[in-house]
């Protein structure tokens, strides 16, 4: 730091801890009054005590004993396990943040997370076992993939996905029993294996441009009653496919619209579903057989 001397000039000043009073970093606070005494003269000012440590843009340490954290703008990435098992209610992620590492919030008590528009990448298992997390608004982010196991066993009730999203990873919403409805963005072309397996969804809106819905993507969703399509996007992919057993074990399913881009249906697509009364199949789909709609015999 610099000091202004009696001659009116500013020069560097060396300050020791003995010359500082009122400062404590034991508890994070928004405002703390600090006084510096040099040669009998005092100067007081306010400082902010951050609950985190940041090195070269990476979040490296989080202090305990807080309920809410607002990350400073200097954070560019959150590393693996950063908030794992933490007892925290709210985290405000800063504008400028680019990525969040594997299992960053694994088994934490977080209830609310504010996501920035600058976020581009999520890694796997981020919100695994986050029972208290009820809503995730990712709609303003720039992520292109929701990775594998993002919300497994989370208490999520509402998820808003960004228009930039192109892929939903395997088991992304596995065992999310509180999730009731979801609209999948129009640019999504791939839905991974068991992406919504045993979730609580009742309705799903699929984009017409989707070309790959992996096996058991909606396997055993006991409350799923309606799968509809929307959007004008059409992908002319001869291999576009809904893979086997995608909707097997959805006993309440009554309406199923197959996206316009799909060409191939896997076997056992609607296995065990006896309440389907409305089925819409695009003209481009290859011949449909009995085994597509039922469990094959062995």
What are the residue ranges of the model-derived segments?
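Interdomain boundary/hinge segments at the C-termini of tandem beta-sandwich modules
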Residues: 47-49
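Secondary-structure transition/turn motif
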Residues: 39-40, 58-68
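Serine/threonine-rich, repeat-prone extracellular segments and beta-strand-based repeat modules
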Residues: 9-45
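Solvent-exposed, low-complexity, repeat-rich "mucin-like" stalks and linkers
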Residues: 1-10
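Conserved small/polar residues in nucleotide/adenosyl-binding loops
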Residues: 290-297
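Surface-exposed repetitive/solenoidal architectures
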Residues: 51-58, 77-85, 104-106, 128, ...
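Structural signature of tandem-repeat unit edges
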Residues: 52, 63-77, 86-99, 108-121, ...
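Consensus positions within tandem repeat domains that build extended binding/scaffold surfaces
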Residues: 81, 102-104, 124-126, 148-150, ...
């Amino acid at each position: 730091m610099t000091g202004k001397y009696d001659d009116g000039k500013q020069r560097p000043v060396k300050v020791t801890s003995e010359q500082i009073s009122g400062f404590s970093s034991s508890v994070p606070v928004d405002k703390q009054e600090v006084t510096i005494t040099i040669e009998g003269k005092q100067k007081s000012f306010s400082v902010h005590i951050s609950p985190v440590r940041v090195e070269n843009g990476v979040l490296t340490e989080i202090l305990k004993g807080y309920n809410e954290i607002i990350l400073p703008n200097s954070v560019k990435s959150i590393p693996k396990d950063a908030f794992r098992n933490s007892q925290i209610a709210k985290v405000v992620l800063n504008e400028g943040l680019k990525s969040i590492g594997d299992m960053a919030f694994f088994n934490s008590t977080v209830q609310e997370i504010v996501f920035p528009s600058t976020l581009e990448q999520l890694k796997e298992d981020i919100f695994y076992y986050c029972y208290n997390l009820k809503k995730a608004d990712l709609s303003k982010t720039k992520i292109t993939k929701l990775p594998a196991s993002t919300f497994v066993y989370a208490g999520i009730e509402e998820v808003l996905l960004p228009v930039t999203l192109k892929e939903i990873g395997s088991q992304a919403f596995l065992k999310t029993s509180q999730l009731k409805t979801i609209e999948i963005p129009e640019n999504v072309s791939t839905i991974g294996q068991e992406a919504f397996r045993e979730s609580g969804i009742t309705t799903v809106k699929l984009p017409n441009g989707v070309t790959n819905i992996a096996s058991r993507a909606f396997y055993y969703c006991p409350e799923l009653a309606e799968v509809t399509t929307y959007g004008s996007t059409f992908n002319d992919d001869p291999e576009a496919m809904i893979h086997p057993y995608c909707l097997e074990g959805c006993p309440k399913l009554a309406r199923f619209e197959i996206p316009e881009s799909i060409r191939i249906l896997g076997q056992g697509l609607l296995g065990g579903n006896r309440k389907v009364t409305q089925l819409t199949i695009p003209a481009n789909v290859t011949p449909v057989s009995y085994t597509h709609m039922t469990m094959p015999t062995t």
